[in-house]
Amino acid sequence: MRLLIFGAGVLGTFYAVKLLAGGHDVTILARGGRAAQIRVDGLVVQEYRRSCLRVRIRVIETMAADQAYDHVLVLVRNDQVESVLPSLAANKATPSFVFMFNNLAGPQRLVDVLGRKRVLLGFPGAAGERAVDGSVVATVLPALIQKTTVGELDGRSTPRVRGLTTGPKTSRLTISSSWRAPATTVGS
């Protein structure tokens, strides 16, 4: 599966490393100093009580309108979403944008900009922090606390949701489908 991770913060870095380790074709979008740092050092994740992973990954600083991915996983803070929506909307080659952030406002703004058929909602089941050197210390949360979830707006099980939830498992990352997708964006 060809994926773009839109955002190179703690969660974007963590999911990029895990999905790359799981056999996916992953690119990360980072800007400015963070993009330069990734080009030099790669992505570095120290998973809690596990070994440190350092991976080389394709880095882009902008998403061209004709760049096609199976899915774009949008892992930015809620207060950054409005600023990234124009570049997501300009891209007509990607059929699916998975928004993974805490969003009390619900999905309507995303649907208004991108169209209902292009929006999936999710919630990350990981936590961590980024060190000054750019490395990330993170962990997958226990499923009892919070699974990584993804779902359609109407809760249906569709091929694109199943594709995200049944990918390679070598990364130790399990993504579950959710029939309550809009609720996942508020941490339910």
Residue ranges and their predicted role:
Residues A105-G187:
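Rossmann-fold dinucleotide-binding core
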Residues C52-A138:
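Rossmann-like NAD(P)(H) cofactor-binding subdomain of soluble oxidoreductases
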Residues Y48-R56, G151-L153:
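Active-site-adjacent segment of FAD-dependent monooxygenases/related oxidoreductases
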Residues M1, H24, P95-S96, K117-R118, ...:
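A structural micro-motif
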Residues I28, V59-I60, V150:
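Generic preference for hydrophobic
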Residues A21, I28-A30, L88, R160, ...:
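Flavin (primarily FAD) cofactor-binding/catalytic cores of flavoenzymes
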Residues M1-E47, L164:
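NAD(P)+-binding Rossmann beta1-loop-alpha1 motif at the extreme N-terminus of oxidoreductases
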